[in-house]
A protein has these predicted regions:
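Short acidic DE-rich linear segments
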Residues: 65-68
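A short, Lys/Arg-rich alpha-helix, primarily the initiator
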Residues: 1-13, 51
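DNA major-groove recognition helix of helix-turn-helix/homeodomain DNA-binding modules
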Residues: 44-63
Length: 68
C-alpha cells in the first residue's frame, strides 16, 4: 500500500492543507509531511482513521495492476 500517495490524494480531495489535515487526524504537520514524502508510514491507529476517510471520499486503498 502506497501511503504517501493515499495520504496526499485524500488530503487534496478533502481540500485541506497539511496543517488542517494534521489537526483533523490529531497528528503534527511534520508527521503529515513525512507520510506524504514517504519517509514514514502511519501507525496502525492512524491507518484506521485514514482508511475510514478514504472510504468516505471514495479513494481506493489498494493499487490496481495497471497503476503498478
Amino acid at each position: 500500500m502506497n501511503f504517501s500517495r493515499i495520504v496526499k490524494e485524500l488530503r487534496t480531495k478533502m481540500m485541506l492543507s497539511q496543517i488542517e489535515f494534521a489537526k483533523k487526524l490529531g497528528v503534527s504537520y511534520a508527521t503529515i509531511n513525512r507520510w506524504e514524502n514517504g519517509h514514514h508510514k502511519p501507525v496502525f491507529n492512524d491507518q484506521r482513521k485514514i482508511a475510514k476517510l478514504c472510504k468516505k471520499y471514495g479513494i481506493e486503498l489498494e493499487e490496481k495492476e495497471e497503476d503498478k
